[in-house]
Every structure is written in C-alpha cells, then in structure tokens.
Amino acid sequence: MPQGLDSKVATRFPGTHLVSLADLDEYKKKLYKKDHASRCPGLVKVDFYGDAKPTWALVLISGENPKRKAELVVARQVDGDWEIRSLETTDGTPVVWREGPGKYEGLYEEEKTIHAPNPVIVFCGYGSWAIVYAWNGKEVEKVWLSD
C-alpha cells in the first residue's frame, strides 16, 4: 500500500486489514492465482477516474468467517492527501482486480449497460457474485456480472 494511505486507512477503518492470499480458502486462492498470479487480492492500482492521479481499490475485512465483513473502497491521491470513497460493503472475503475501459452489460434485464471510458474495478465473491464499478465523469456506476 502506498505510503500515507496505510495510516489513513488504519485511522478511518480501525480493526480492518487488506484481504491477502492467506485470507482465502484453498479453492478461492487457486482461482485467484490462476488469473492474477501472486498479486494481492485486496489491493489493485487502477486509473479509475481517468485523471492519472495515484488511485487504488482496496478490500478491507474485519472479523472471522462466517461473520466476516468486507468493504470495497477506492482511494485517490489529490494534492498530497488521500480522498477515500466507500463503494460497497458485504459479507465474506471478496477480492478485487481491474479491467480495461469498455462495455459491461449487466446480468439482469433491468440493469443498464455501462460504457466505461476508464479502467473499471471488479469486486468478486468467488463462486457467488461479481460487480463492475465504473466512473462516468460524474458518479460511480455499477452492474452485476454474475450472481
């Protein structure tokens, strides 16, 4: 985690830690490593806002399964400080990665299609769900890719 962001996260989200490979069960660890090698499953650098400022997506967890809580946050460095936005909270031990700009169609008919001009954040609970988050220039949009 970048210097300065770690202390900001510790202050704002006490009692949490980044999801690591050690937090995943063997099956989920195998799935993650197959696609992402040995990268940290709870941290990814992503140009989410399209402004080239240092920006990271983090999955912070607290507690133990089956009562574990997870929160997806995006942190962007602006003028030397970190701007942190919470995108989602859920149960379990999800992972995060980035995908490129493009078209992302929602799983459900009522969901719109996102046309992401910048890289997107994928928040995934293996074997259960995956959600794509994109910045459209004004707000964060999300669609479910699987359920």
Language-model region placement:
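Structural motif
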Residues: 64-74, 128-132
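Acidic, small-residue rich beta-repeat scaffolds with periodic aromatic anchors
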Residues: 1-18, 82, 90-147
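Acidic, glycine-anchored loop motifs typical of Ca2+
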Residues: 46-56
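Terminal domain-start segments
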Residues: 1-44
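Beta-strand C-termini and the immediately following turn/loop, strongest in propeller blades
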Residues: 59-62
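Residue-level detector of short, conserved catalytic/binding motifs and their immediate flanks
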Residues: 41, 54-56, 70-72
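Extracellular C-terminal loop/segment signatures of secreted glycoproteins
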Residues: 70-90
